[in-house]
Design a protein with these regions (language model features):
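Basic/polar N-terminal segments that are highly enriched at the extreme N-terminus
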Residues: 1-7
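Core segments of cupin and vicinal oxygen chelate
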Residues: 7-10, 16-61, 101
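Vicinal oxygen chelate
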Residues: 21-23, 69-127
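Compositionally biased, low-complexity repeat tracts
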Residues: 5, 42, 50, 75-77, ...
């Protein structure tokens, strides 16, 4: 049996995703999904911007780190290890209806997940 580490003070802080168009991502995550920009820092010497967005204080709830590399012109390769970012809502059916009206592409209509009963749906952000 392996030993357990002392996890006192551990918490999930953020997940980082790279975005091609920071303003389009702000529009999607903040205006469409209701997140707030928690902080944004430009790094001119490195030619990138980091922005942290979320629904609560960065010190209290997990957030997304959006990294915008200024010279990136091509879409990012997501690889086969990346899955998704989950955002929970009270009514996934209504949320998808509202998002569709705003032009958001729903890639999996709301319904029970395979081999389960939890209702899920998927949509695309500006980077797909």
């Amino acid at each position: 049996m392996s030993k357990e580490a002392n996890r006192d003070g551990y918490r999930l802080a953020h997940t980082m995703i790279r975005v091609r168009d920071l303003e389009a991502s702000f529009n999607f995550y903040c205006k469409t999904l209701g997140m707030k920009i928690l902080r944004k820092t430009d790094y001119p010497d490195g030619r990138f911007t980091n922005a942290f967005i979320g629904y609560g204080l960065e010190t209290e709830s997990p957030c997304l780190e959006l990294t915008h590399n200024w010279d990136q012109k091509e879409n990012y390769d997501k690889g086969n290890g990346w899955g998704h970012v989950c955002i929970e809502t009270r009514d996934v059916y209504k949320a998808c209806e509202d998002l569709s009206k705003l032009g958001v592409k729903i890639t999996r209509a709301p319904g029970p997940m395979k081999h389960g009963t939890r209702v899920i749906a998927f949509c695309e952000d500006p980077d797909g």
